[in-house]
């Protein structure tokens, strides 16, 4: 696992690994087609993306990427994992996925945090989690009128005040312009990639074909 390689083998960071909740989210545009957005929402999306789009690409053509913004996307799955009995021979890694209706999966994920990962020593971990997964979940909770669990209530905190772990941040070594995908990082470190079955860019098309 990438996290263990970076923290335990490479950087010798001392952590109680049973206190870490690993997570990854999958997101898609809130509505399948740009043309089905309200007129106001179409204008807002055009304004939101005007600096990301090339001049010859319209907002409608760019809409397939709408899932990366919490204001225009929804979460369709939150997958989590955690270690049990890490320090002995009975060590295991348990995995659970919350999927389906977004409101329900957000509530279920919140209950997991509040009931099992609510202490100061508990940490969240993701790849690019601090800039994507953690704030995305928080924003979607607010949009859906779900009060934030303490672990995601990061309002007003500076980056260095957020205790959660980000494997991409570990790899940056202070170079904040550097982006490395999870697939690339696992490849160069010789770790089996968890992202081989489907790429992030294909999630929306697969989701809407099946739903």
Task: Identify the meaning behind each predicted range.
Residues 4-6:
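Short hydrophobic targeting helices and cationic amphipathic motifs
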Residues 11-111, 115:
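Conserved RNase H-like, two-metal-ion catalytic cores of nucleic-acid enzymes
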Residues 13-18, 73-100, 116-211:
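Metal-dependent phosphoesterase core characteristic of DEDDh/y 3'-5' exonuclease domains
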């Amino acid at each position: 696992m990438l996290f263990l390689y970076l923290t335990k083998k490479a950087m010798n960071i001392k952590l109680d690994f049973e206190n870490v909740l690993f997570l990854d989210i999958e997101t898609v545009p809130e509505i399948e087609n740009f043309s089905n957005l309200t007129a106001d929402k179409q204008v807002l999306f055009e304004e939101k993306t005007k600096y990301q789009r090339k001049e010859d690409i319209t907002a409608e053509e760019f809409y397939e990427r709408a899932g990366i913004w919490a204001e225009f996307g929804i979460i369709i799955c939150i997958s989590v994992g955690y270690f049990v009995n890490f320090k002995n021979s009975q060590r295991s890694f348990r995995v659970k996925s919350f999927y389906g209706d977004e409101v329900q999966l957000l509530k279920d994920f919140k209950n997991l945090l509040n009931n099992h990962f609510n202490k100061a020593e508990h940490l969240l971990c993701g790849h690019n989690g601090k800039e994507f997964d953690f704030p995305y979940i928080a924003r979607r909770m607010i949009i859906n009128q779900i009060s934030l669990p303490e672990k995601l209530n990061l309002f007003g905190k500076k980056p260095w005040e957020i205790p959660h772990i980000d494997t991409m941040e570990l790899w940056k070594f202070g170079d904040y312009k550097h982006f490395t995908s999870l697939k690339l990082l696992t490849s160069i470190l010789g770790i089996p990639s968890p992202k081989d079955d489907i790429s992030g860019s294909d999630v929306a098309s697969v989701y809407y074909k099946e739903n």
